[in-house]
Amino acid sequence: MRVSKLIKYCFSFLILLLLTSCSSKQSNANIIVPESPKNHIAYFTTEKITIDGKGEENAWKEALWSDSFIDIEGEKIPKFKTQFKMLWDDKNLYFYSKMEDPHIWASLKQRDTVVFYNNDFEIFIDPNGDTHNYMEIELNAYNTLWDLFLTKPYRNNSTVLNQWDIKGFQSNIHVSGTLNDASDIDDYWAIEIAIPWISLQEEIGKKTPILGQTWRINFSRVHWEFDLIDGMYYRKKDDKGGFLPEYNWVWSPQGVINMHQPEKWGFVHFAKKIDQKHQPKFQYPDDNSLVLWMYSQYRSQLDLINDSLKSKSIFPIKGSIES
């Protein structure tokens, strides 16, 4: 989303606040610009990549590891390490992720089920970075896929296309240990993925990346505490019978427990590796700080207006303000 569009949204919200006699004691004078999202460089490859979950090709060995994942709110360090790598060629976008886990388990096998009810790995892709029309991909250790397309974030009353399927999608799992076997201690499980550019082009209208292009992408790992019942893994429950909350470990932290804030996703820069002495370096967009600040204002005003409309009977409007 361009800065001019953000300014228009925020200005409109401020005017509406005045018209509805809403007030706030909060001052925007000391607003702190949110921390810049993570960044990563994806290298071009000419090597044939076999999607077997192992990532053993030379191209993968030379690809950069991401920073280790952190808690979604940005402070706590996860108990198990998670990292990813990325590559691309003329036909596909590739992902490889490695997740430490002493107990690797899964139960869901049906496509497009709610995969995050198991431990899973998730990818969010917004090619043009406008926070709208993005895809979400989830996989568990059974390689069960849930792929969905969102026209906009949930905060804006999104239309979720759960029936959407990524054409030509490939993935495979490698387990260093045993799946669903509580009698031993496992090492890690890994996911390898290939997404054809043609699928992105057909669904999003985005062509194959060119050198220097940057996309907004983020990654999440959902991890549950478990109970063992008759040798089988189940999500752990509390004393009242409810499930304990899951852990959400992510690449670029969101600040809140919500992955659907695309403006906070990381930057992935597409490049060709020249040699060890001439590594490409990522540079944030010139307006990055301004865009982050404008989005923080947009979210604050949206929440304030919706809360005010609900509480003031003098202004009998039902529903909420949308983007």
Question: For the regions a protein language model found, what residue spans apply to each?
Answer:
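Bacterial N-terminal signal peptides that target proteins for export
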Residues: 2-11
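Bacterial N-terminal signal peptides
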Residues: 10-20
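Structural preference for beta-rich elements and adjacent junctions enriched in aromatics
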Residues: 22-309, 319
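Periplasmic/extracellular, small/polar-rich flexible segments of pilin-like filament-forming proteins
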Residues: 311-323
